[in-house]
């Protein structure tokens, strides 16, 4: 290969710092000063200007002054659309729900299983069987069966809590000792009729002495009044009773009422009393 092919292009021009100097045998020594080339296109010998090269046009900016940049337009896929899509809960495929938003569930075209798109109706809930069958049942249901003939699985849902768990309320009432069996029980009803049935012996007793005494007095008083009325009726209609047999019936009715009131008074007088021992507030 000739020496001229290894020499750099434009070997007769320098850059003022010694770079790009000629590498031929006629190059000056390192210690000598290098001539400086005149600027391109400036005054100088005509032989220094390259021949046959047109002049470069004036440089223009990439963006024309006073013109706004083009508007931003994101790239969109031609296959993408605005149709609402959901993911299948079984095979994770996309399901087009356009025109089906009024339904509660939609069917997947890949696995043919149902996927809910709305909440269950009031009082209902969705349950998915291990065979991927979507079931709907009551909120309070604890056991349901899969209707598919090849499954027929019984699903235990467990207890259902209608609301958030809250601690049990503290008992409010009166702790009393039964007048019959002497066992303690809690009584929560407070009224003028303070009669309590013991949960142990199932017998009725009174909470305190006030209520049975009041009832006993009223029954005895009413019984005495009825007895006096019966006695007066007997004395006043004694002579007429021989002619009118219905008078005997009136005597009997008054006497029975008097005996019933007196008997009820005796019942209240013999009523067992349960005494309160502790109260909760």
Curated annotation (Swiss-Prot):
Purpose of the protein: Catalyzes the hydrolysis of phosphatidylinositol-4,5-bisphosphate (PtdIns-4,5-P2) to phosphatidylinositol-4-phosphate (PtdIns-4-P).
Major site of localization recorded for this protein: membrane
Protein topology in the membrane: Multi-pass membrane protein
Q: Where are the transmembrane segments?
A: 216-236, 251-271
Provide this UniProt record's keywords sorted from A to Z.
Endosome, Hydrolase, Lipid metabolism, Lysosome, Membrane, Transmembrane, Transmembrane helix
Q: Does the keyword Transmembrane apply?
A: yes
From which source organism is this entry? Xenopus laevis (African clawed frog)
Stated name of the protein: Type 1 phosphatidylinositol 4,5-bisphosphate 4-phosphatase
Listed GO MF terms: phosphatidylinositol-4,5-bisphosphate 4-phosphatase activity
What spans are recorded as compositionally biased (Gly residues)?
A: 14-23
Lineage in the entry?
A: Eukaryota, Metazoa, Chordata, Craniata, Vertebrata
Q: Name a single GO cellular component.
A: phagocytic vesicle membrane
